[in-house]
Structures are given as C-alpha cells and as structure tokens.
A protein has these predicted regions:
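Conserved beta-strand scaffold positions in the cores of enzyme catalytic domains, especially
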Residues: 18, 96, 155-157
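Conserved nucleotide-sensing/catalytic segment adjacent to the nucleotide-binding pocket
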Residues: 14-90, 127
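Conserved nucleotide-binding/hydrolysis micro-motifs of P-loop NTPases
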Residues: 24-25, 75-76, 100-105, 162-164
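"Short basic amphipathic alpha-helical interaction patches in structured regions
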Residues: 8-9, 83-86, 110
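Conserved GTP-binding G-domain of TRAFAC-class P-loop NTPases and closely related GTPase folds
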Residues: 108-184
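Glycine-rich phosphate-binding P-loop
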Residues: 1-11
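Conserved phosphate-donor/acceptor-positioning beta-strand/loop module used by diverse small-molecule
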Residues: 89-111
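Short amphipathic alpha-helical segments and helix-helix/interface helices
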Residues: 6, 58, 84, 140-147
C-alpha cells in the first residue's frame, strides 16, 4: 500500500525522492547488533540518530529544490504542519495523502514484512503494538488537525490498492472518509 502510493505520487510529480525514516534506520551504526539482541524492539532502540538524519535530509532536499515525498505515520500533526510551512516558504506546493487500511490488514503487513526480512536474511523491522495502535488511531485526528489548522486545504485519503480515494476538505469529513475506505 505505502510503496505503491509513494510510487504513484512520485510519477505524478514527474519523479523525485522519497524519504522514509525506516530506510535511514538501516544505516544506524549498531543496527546489526540491535537486530540480533532485540529484533522486536529494533525500531525503538535504533531511534537515536534517525530523527536528526531525517531532518537533515529534508532540509538538504528542500534547499536543492528536489520534488519529495516524505513518508510519515501521521502521528504528530504539529511536526507535519511546521515542515509543510518550511516547504511553502521555500516556494513548494504541499499536499497530504493518507493511506487508510483495515486494521487487521495493517497488522498482518507488519508480520509479513518481518517474516520476509528474516527469511531473506535482511534486518527485520517490527512495529510494536503500542506504536501501531497509536499511529492507526491517530491518523483521523491528524488529518482533522491539518485541515482545521489551515495547514492544507485538502487531504486525499487513499485505499491500500489505490482503487479508492476521497478528497477531504473539512475536518468533519476526515473520520468518515477514513472509516469508509478502511471498511470497504
């Protein structure tokens, strides 16, 4: 779902770069040791430099005027709003796309991603129950806040397969649109 959505957005922009903090996490100097010692907490234990790396990369890309997709969990609207303002001040046009996936499909995706990495000899990434629940539940609030703060005039809610999308331009529409796509 996420990869397909990001690729579709990049194509519609005429190409660009995607920033995914989970990919940057794999560059952590202790990632191999962390993954061996506690693979189910790898995301938490490797957080240290990842936020700073992500911020530095975003700043560099903005300064170099690249088209960019910033993958995010939609967990913290205030950070997203501030970053959008930074891009707009630099002359960018910003938009927000939220992926709405049924909860069980989302959880199964975590398990499948982890198993595929282990079977492929790669570094597995697990998302904790708390992290998943917070991000999954928080997306509705974040979309509502982005709209009510005036960060963006609209947010596109997209289904996992990209076959459905709903353009939301009012905070009151956000929860219903996300629920509709998740349940359809």
């Amino acid at each position: 779902g996420k990869s397909r959505t990001i690729n579709n957005v990049l194509k519609s922009m005429g190409d660009g770069l995607a920033i995914d903090s989970d990919e940057l996490r794999l560059l952590h100097p202790d990632i191999a040791r962390i993954s061996q010692l506690d693979p189910l907490r790898m995301d938490v234990l490797s957080n240290g430099p990842v936020g700073e790396w992500t911020k530095a990369l975003i700043t560099h890309i903005r300064e170099q005027r690249f088209n960019v997709v910033i993958e995010n969990t939609f967990a913290r609207s205030e950070i997203m709003a501030a970053e959008a303002k930074n891009f707009e001040r630099a002359g960018y046009q910003c938009s927000f796309i939220a992926l709405a996936v049924p909860e069980l499909v989302s959880r199964l995706g975590i398990v499948n991603r982890y198993r595929a990495a282990v079977q492929g000899g790669n570094i597995p990434r697990w998302t904790s129950e708390v992290s998943h629940t917070n991000a999954y539940a928080g997306i509705k609030t974040t979309v509502q806040e982005l709209l009510s703060l005036g960060t963006t005039p609209e947010v596109t809610i997209v289904s996992r397969f990209g076959d459905q999308n709903i353009l939301v331009d009012s905070p009151d529409q956000a929860a219903d649109a996300i629920t509709h796509i998740r349940e359809d």
